[in-house]
Amino acid sequence: MPEPVDPLHLLLIGAGPGVGAGVVRRFGREGFRSTLISRNETLEQLAPELRGEGLEIETVGADIEDLDGYRKTLERIFGAPGAPGVVVYNAALPDPDQILDTTVERLRTAHDVDVIGAVVAAQVAAPALRAAGGGTLLATSGGFADNPVPALASLSIGKAALRSAQTLIAAGVRDDGIHAATVTIAGAVKPGTDFDPNNIAELFWTAHTDSKDAWQTEYRFTGA
């Protein structure tokens, strides 16, 4: 039997100082506590900053490239009381590569991080969210899903596949009151521009708070 879900508990997978931190801050303003999953070196830098802003932050070190270990980490989180009612998958492997030069190993690793990690998160979270009567599963996508960039071959493939995966997940959980969607950022994220992380975070909040009759499987951010 899944443990009870806390609707004011956000799980951010792939925590970083840009969009991820913006989402944590936006949800934090609404009283959410956050659990951040990332590699330890990222958490060591980000978590103290967010706590210094008065946000309630827990951290869990995990490497999505180790899918078995990553799944076990998620199972521990969702097997404890107060499991997250909102999951945001924000992980990606953005290193440049060219499709005709990259290796099979590189393509597989990127696919694990860009796509499979989101699917695993949904697989683990869905039973708890179903038992709770609802929840939210969001994933960060990008304009590369629409317009592949030759110098970012693996990432372009991954973002397109992620959108397809989230659409399938959405179809599988909608009747359970769970909203699954991608948030597609159609531009370069940079503070102080139209693509400021805090502006983008507002769209994540909209996706989470939309009424069921307004649910979309993709929310697009094209600039403030």
Write out the residue ranges for each language-model feature.
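Conserved glycine-rich cofactor-binding loop
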Residues: G16-P17
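Conserved glycine-rich Rossmann-like NAD(P)H-binding loop of the short-chain dehydrogenase/reductase
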Residues: G31-Q45
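Rossmann-fold cofactor-recognition segment
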Residues: L50-D68
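Amphipathic alpha-helical dimer-interface segment in Rossmann-like NAD(P)H-dependent oxidoreductases
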Residues: G79, V113-A131
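Conserved NAD(P)H cofactor-binding loop of Rossmann-fold oxidoreductase domains
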Residues: V88-P96
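Catalytic Tyr-X3-Lys loop
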Residues: L100-V119
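Catalytic loop of short-chain dehydrogenase/reductase
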Residues: A110, R130, T136-A161, T167, ...
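C-terminal helical subdomain
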Residues: S164-T167, D175-A224
